[in-house]
Amino acid sequence: MTATVKDELSRLRVAKPCCRRAEMAAMLRFAGGLHIVGGRIVVEAELDTGATARRLRREIAEVFGFPSSVAVLAAGGLRRSVRYIVRVERDGEQLARSTGLLDQRGRPVRGLPPQVVTGSACDAAAAWRGAFLAHGSLTEPGRSCSMEVTSPGPEAALALVGAARRMGVQAKSRDVRGVDRVVVRDGDAIGALLTKIGAHDSLMAWEERRMRREVRATANRLANFDDANLRRSARAAVAAGARVQAAMRILGDDAPDHLLAAGRLRLEHAQASLEELGALADPPLTKDAVAGRIRRLLALADKRANALGIPNTEASVSPELFENA
């Protein structure tokens, strides 16, 4: 869903100047860098969508009045997709100072500028919006759902973690194979963060997919539960049938007719429930009455088996019976 979120954020209009500055500062910090070209400082930002590049150029022009250029790098080699390079050359140093990429002494700022780090909650949201547009990703809802931003260094990552904390969202900074990442994994936290940065339509789509997945997961759990119950019922029916068959072999005709009739019903309708067996009886019986008669039949047979010194009905229930149950 990364492209969906970035497309929506690229079209979002922000009115407050402090928020526009914070967003640009984060976007340039997470997507760009400072270069010395011909003795002058040049600001560059490498972005993955044309809409994001257009947004950055528009903001630089409207907020600071600086012109910029854009170069398109086609996919190929190590580049898996088209990249857009936004470059400010003539006014690069002024832009770097204005956005906090350089401090008052002209030294590069490794994290986010102080005015963003100590700013209000709206500045924190703007910084996250800029960082996500620059180098963010959002995975589909699921067990491993995450909202991530790849950071240029640990200082910028920690600054972004702090910005999330000011919005009441828990984010973590992690070093993954030498690359600093800021990660939000909790589904509710991701939803809150999408709301804060202004991705409301994307949030609705993400929550809908999340809900669909939860419904499917619940349905699967219930299906598995039903399957387990069916397997248990099948195994119980197989065991009951085997014991009844053994009981009738042990007793022969030396058992009350009503008990033998219940046993025959069990053997003739092996998969039927006790309630169904009761309905098949003549006259009809309750399921408790059927269960009681079968129980007495088995007890009578076990008593006879013990007296004769032969295996009782439980001995007829072997593991082989359950191979297909």
Swiss-Prot record:
Residues 273-306 bind DNA. GO terms for molecular function: DNA binding. InterPro entries: Homing_endonucl (IPR027434), Sporu_reg_WhiA_N_dom (IPR018478), Sporulation_regulator_WhiA (IPR003802), Sporulation_regulator_WhiA_C (IPR023054), WhiA_LAGLIDADG_dom (IPR039518). Keywords: Cell cycle, Cell division, DNA-binding. GO terms for biological process: cell division; regulation of sporulation. Belongs to the WhiA family. NCBIfam families: DNA_bind_WhiA. Involved in cell division and chromosome segregation. This is Probable cell division protein WhiA. The gene is whiA.
